[in-house]
Amino acid sequence: MIGIIGAMEEEVTILKNKLTQLSEISVAHVKFYTGILKDREVVITQSGIGKVNAAISTTLLINKFKPDVIINTGSAGALDESLNVGDVLISDDVKYHDADATAFGYEYGQIPQMPVAFQSSKPLIEKVSQVVQQQQLTAKVGLIVSGDSFIGSVEQRQKIKKAFPNAMAVEMEATAIAQTCYQFNVPFVVVRAVSDLANGEAEMSFEAFLEKAAVSSSQTVEALVSQL
């Protein structure tokens, strides 16, 4: 069983509509769609936006469906200036950009008693990288950071870049999903696409290009599923 998590309806609808033998259940106001995609058993959930929603949905998915791997799909704001709308983002590490326990000796972004970063599954990273090469998509592997804020100003962007110079993208769920997977020992990878450039025009760009980002990320996830 392969678990796929997206925060918004636009981020999961494309994949959900491709499921055969579709079945739907709801647990704690979270909808889960099970079926067959590329001859593989999958469960897709729309988690809702933000870290708590993501953690709840991931926990429910793991407990009820026992997935072998989890893929987080959707959109993100680019922090790397070489990225453009529609480019595919593949996580190697994910971190929180809004966690601060430095007073107790932890690194900025680190939750106490948790790793500095949550590492994606190397085999999954390799498979996604192969998929995007085959599809001739522009993609980048790197650090994705998460927090409970939509990054829509130059000031917000600069603050994150100062704290995490190597971060390529920012969004609102991936690290919570990753932390949950870490605690349940489930391999994960984040496969998203750029919807905006996390700057003063981010809100307008996000609304205009969310669909393009959803198509790019969904295409990649569908191809990845066929390889698992």
UniProtKB/Swiss-Prot annotation:
UniProt entry keywords in alphabetical sequence: Amino-acid biosynthesis, Hydrolase, Methionine biosynthesis
Pathway: Amino-acid biosynthesis; L-methionine biosynthesis via salvage pathway; S-methyl-5-thio-alpha-D-ribose 1-phosphate from S-methyl-5'-thioadenosine (hydrolase route): step 1/2
Active-site residues, as the UniProt record annotates them: E11, D196
Record-listed E.C. numbers: 3.2.2.9
KW Transport (keyword) present: no
Binding residue positions for substrate: G77, I151, M172, E173
Protein transport in keyword set: no
Single GO BP term: L-methionine salvage from methylthioadenosine
Reactions catalysed according to its record: S-adenosyl-L-homocysteine + H2O = S-(5-deoxy-D-ribos-5-yl)-L-homocysteine + adenine; S-methyl-5'-thioadenosine + H2O = 5-(methylsulfanyl)-D-ribose + adenine; 5'-deoxyadenosine + H2O = 5-deoxy-D-ribose + adenine
Xref: SUPFAM superfamilies: Purine and uridine phosphorylases
Gene Ontology cellular component terms for the protein in this record: cytosol
A molecular function (GO) term: methylthioadenosine nucleosidase activity
Domain of life: Bacteria
Family membership noted in the UniProt record: Belongs to the PNP/UDP phosphorylase family. MtnN subfamily.
Function, in words: Catalyzes the irreversible cleavage of the glycosidic bond in both 5'-methylthioadenosine (MTA) and S-adenosylhomocysteine (SAH/AdoHcy) to adenine and the corresponding thioribose, 5'-methylthioribose and S-ribosylhomocysteine, respectively. Also cleaves 5'-deoxyadenosine, a toxic by-product of radical S-adenosylmethionine (SAM) enzymes, into 5-deoxyribose and adenine.
NCBIfam families the record matches: MTA_SAH-Nsdase, PRK05584.1
Protein name in UniProt: 5'-methylthioadenosine/S-adenosylhomocysteine nucleosidase
Lineage: Bacteria, Bacillati, Bacillota, Bacilli, Bacillales
Gene this chain is encoded by: mtnN
